[in-house]
């Protein structure tokens, strides 16, 4: 393993880190930049559905006007990201990260350093309407055991036609308005391999009957699980739709279902039952499970931008997801709610947020959330949740802040208290036993040179059942331009 790390590290020292530029995968700094500008009323770009497209970001910032020094600083940061876009380019890239053990540290958005030692190299090819990103990662002291020595997460091939992107590969996803988590499609697990389809530019409909919807986006997903032992070759399907009928409101609806796999029906009629939600949960806890076509989740989310409504730079948002019951609305719901505020002090932009999450079943610990009586490994891949990072039957309150010290230094900090795995479900390998945690997590991103970024991180976790954990991590990334 260390020999493989050394080989990849050798390549990474003579290549450069970059990423294809038409599509932006989960990126905390980019999300924070856009969220801050949205809250300030400078831009209107949805960050509730990832990946984001460069053309959609460009559409909004092309008409954005900065009124203050802080707004100009953050807007310029996004413009620099987009100015790197070229219509035809080949890029090589590499990254090295090191960290101490982090078994108890809750994951957050774009938190993809999941090994003690991790080295990644690859190549990206970008044209105006297509792009390919091939990358290989070797990990030692892995947090998630994926039974492979070399992983290709983050690799994809994508094409754009008639304002529609089709992406095939192993890419992260994010559905929802939360800062720290999504109840239905988060990025705590290794990405599910599959196909994603979504719009490029999120213009409002031109029809006089539909123009009231405002800017809108959809995302469709179809893929297959890796290492899902309970039902090998199980499939995952999902759909999300968002719309902003007014500048101060974004609404979203999401649905996923696990279907098929070894020993399960894979007929067209069975898929139709799963797609329409018929027969779902009719045979729950019954020995006759043939009629239950899928493990389904669904729900809604909303985000209210107070800057556009009452000139206060703040957002209020919420999400609820439940078991997608046949013939009705979701039941046995999980909830997420939060508020954030964006301003500046002495010309330095900052953002504050508070977020509460409850993944119990409508407030009760029942061992139902992210679980299923057929797909008994649950709504997890390799034991890590596809939804909220803490898994089912958890409660969490998080308070966080982001500070832009200048155009080269960005700090992200979070204090979180959580009750995890209160049903004591073994399928949750992220937190395999009932516990109470209090954690503080601080990271610093430094643009050392125009082509070099260094990130450092320190955290501390206090646990009821385990000894306290204090950890540190660092990574270095190089770019071609």
Region annotations inferred by a language model:
Residues 47, 106-112, 142-146, 183-186, ...:
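Outer-membrane beta-barrel domain signature
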Residues 98-104, 127-129, 138-142, 161-163, ...:
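Transmembrane beta-strands of outer-membrane beta-barrel pores
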Residues 18-111:
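N-terminal periplasmic/intermembrane-space "pro-region" immediately following the signal or transit peptide
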Residues 23, 46-50, 68-70, 80-92, ...:
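Short loop/turn motifs that connect adjacent beta-strands in outer-membrane beta-barrel proteins
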Residues 194, 241, 446, 467-481:
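Outer-membrane beta-barrel "beta-signal"
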Residues 12-17:
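N-terminal signal peptide c-region/cleavage motif recognized by signal peptidases
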Residues 194-375, 399, 411, 419-426, ...:
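Signature for the C-terminal beta-barrel architecture of outer-membrane proteins
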Residues 112-119, 147-155, 188-198, 233-237, ...:
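Residues that define the transmembrane beta-barrel architecture of outer-membrane proteins
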């Amino acid at each position: 393993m260390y020999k493989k790390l050394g080989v990849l590290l050798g390549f990474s020292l003579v290549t450069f880190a970059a990423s294809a530029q038409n599509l932006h995968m989960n990126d905390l700094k980019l999300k924070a930049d856009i969220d801050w500008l949205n809250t300030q009323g400078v831009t209107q770009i949805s960050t509730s559905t990832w990946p984001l497209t460069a053309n959609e970001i460009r559409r909004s910032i092309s008409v954005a006007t900065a009124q203050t020094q802080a707004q100009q600083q953050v807007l310029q940061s996004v413009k620099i990201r987009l100015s790197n876009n070229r219509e035809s380019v080949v890029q090589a890239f590499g990254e090295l990260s090191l960290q101490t053990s982090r078994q108890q540290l809750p994951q957050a958005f774009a938190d993809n350093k999941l090994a003690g030692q991790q080295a990644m190299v690859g190549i990206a090819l970008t044209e105006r309407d297509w792009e390919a990103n091939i990358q290989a990662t070797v990990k030692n002291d892995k947090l998630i055991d994926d039974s492979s020595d070399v992983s290709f997460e983050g690799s994809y091939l994508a094409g754009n036609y008639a304002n529609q992107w089709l992406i095939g590969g192993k890419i992260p996803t994010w559905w929802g308005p939360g800062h720290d988590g999504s109840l239905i499609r988060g990025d705590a697990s290794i990405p599910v391999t599959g196909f994603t389809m979504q719009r490029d530019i999120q213009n409002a409909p031109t029809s006089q009957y539909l123009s009231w919807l405002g800017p809108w986006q959809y995302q469709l997903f179809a893929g297959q699980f890796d290492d899902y032992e309970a039902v090998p070759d199980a499939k995952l399907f999902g759909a999300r739709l968002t719309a902003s009928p007014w500048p101060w409101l974004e609404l979203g609806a999401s649905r996923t279902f696990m279907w098929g796999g070894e020993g399960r029906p894979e007929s067209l009629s069975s898929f139709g039952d799963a797609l329409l939600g018929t027969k779902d949960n009719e045979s729950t806890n019954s020995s006759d499970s043939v009629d239950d076509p899928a493990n389904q989740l669904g729900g809604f989310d909303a985000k209210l931008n107070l800057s556009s409504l009452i000139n206060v730079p703040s957002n209020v948002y919420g999400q609820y997801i439940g078991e997608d019951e046949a013939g009705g609305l979701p039941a046995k719901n999980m909830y997420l709610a939060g508020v954030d505020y964006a301003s500046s002090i002495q010309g330095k932009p900052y953002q504050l947020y508070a977020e509460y999450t409850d993944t119990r079943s409508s407030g009760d610990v029942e061992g139902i959330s992210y679980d299923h009586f057929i797909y008994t490994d649950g709504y997890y891949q390799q034991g890590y949740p596809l939804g909220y990072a803490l898994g089912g039957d958890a409660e969490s309150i998080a308070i966080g802040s982001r500070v832009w010290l200048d155009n080269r230094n960005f700090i992200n900090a979070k204090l979180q208290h959580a009750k995890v795995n209160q049903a004591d479900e073994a399928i949750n390998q992220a937190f395999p036993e009932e516990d109470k945690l209090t954690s503080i997590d601080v990271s610093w991103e430094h643009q050392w040179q125009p082509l070099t970024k260094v990130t450092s991180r320190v955290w501390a976790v206090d646990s009821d059942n385990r000894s306290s954990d204090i950890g540190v991590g660092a990574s270095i990334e190089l770019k071609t331009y």
